[in-house]
Amino acid sequence: MSKSKDKWGFSTRSIHIGNSPDKEEGSVSQPIHLTSTFKQDGVGKNRGHDYSRVSNPTRARLEENLATLDNAKHAICYSTGMAATTALFQLFDAGDHILISRNTYGGTYRMSMNVLKRQGLTFDWIDTTDPENVAKYIRPNTKLVHVETPTNPLLELCDLEKTAAVCKAAGVLLSVDNTFMSPYGQRPLDLGGDVVMQSSTKSLSGHSDVLGGVLTTNSDDLDERLRFLLKATGGVPSPFDNWILLRSTKTLELRYQKSSDNAVELANWLDGLGLSRVIFPGLDGHPQHEVAKKQQRTPDGSVIYGNMISIDVGSNEARDRFLEKLSVFTLAESLGGVESLCCVPFDMTHAAVPVERKLKMGITESLIRLSIGIEDVADLKADLQNALSK
């Protein structure tokens, strides 16, 4: 007797859940439902969908797929990762308070401080590496603790089980931006999180060819409220983008494991070169190395450290020389693709964050974030070695 679908392994689910052969024509690849509206059999009598802003068959298949990868009951897909984060924060009212990891993605800072703050939400940006520190900042009007783990770009980790216990005791929701780890490397709902956010533009897609975002949860109430907001605000992905993502998750395990293996080899090599800083959770000297070993696990239980490395080359001159000499790595924003990318967070991904704040956190002008791809690791090492040579 074959296993039931909920007992399938990660890759089997990523390939088959939401991807069963089309019932009408038998096509193995899911069709794309490129339609804005649907025929109704009578007034208010539809066949499951009425308008693609509300729902679309291709999006429904993708949501089924992404939910199973996160071990979630529900998944809600958005046009971008920022659309997903904005929807999450829009669950709350003027006067409510949200705590956020201190070196979160710059787009989250821009949206929170320049948009939602004007609408009455209040924010504090705190060190979430220590659960006791999180507890100190929770107020009576705190509604949400939103953490990145690892953070972007300094790769600080939050102990999710301990932080979830703090939030539960205070009656506060815990949301986790899991973009850097993907469901293959970390499943925050299993560790006590209430909502998981991911930019599906990144490792879920893995080919730098689509924008998307997703929220997953086991809460029926949160799912209902988030779907109402999505219907009201309209930040939905197109059917084609949904289909591209549904295709891409089939290879998530292969891509993420290979890129992470490459990152481990490169980080250990870089750590011996005498750079100002090499930041990677897999290094013994990383402050939260033990947390990484505890919670960053593949579905079979193996420890995994992710595919992101940050290095500080010490000066703007060294940075510019490094970037100019690269030939395999591409200078570009984003991450998680099959191709290796690099960026300077100070001027790129975190440009919206005030200079004083960046420097206080350790985001210097000479800090370079590396997104490790699936190329031959020898070629990546040679490219970095050449770029670092004087």
Protein language model features and the residues they cover:
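Short, solvent-exposed beta-strand edge segments and adjacent coil->beta transition regions
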Residues: 210-212, 304-308, 365-369
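Conserved PLP-enzyme active-site core in the AAT-like
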Residues: 2-6, 16, 75-279
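PLP-dependent enzyme catalytic core of the Aspartate aminotransferase-like
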Residues: 122-124, 317, 324-325, 340-390
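Conserved N-terminal alpha-helix of the aminotransferase class I/II PLP-enzyme fold
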Residues: 37-86, 90-91, 107-114
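Short, well-ordered beta-strand elements within core beta-sheets of diverse protein domains
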Residues: 245-254, 306-314, 369-373
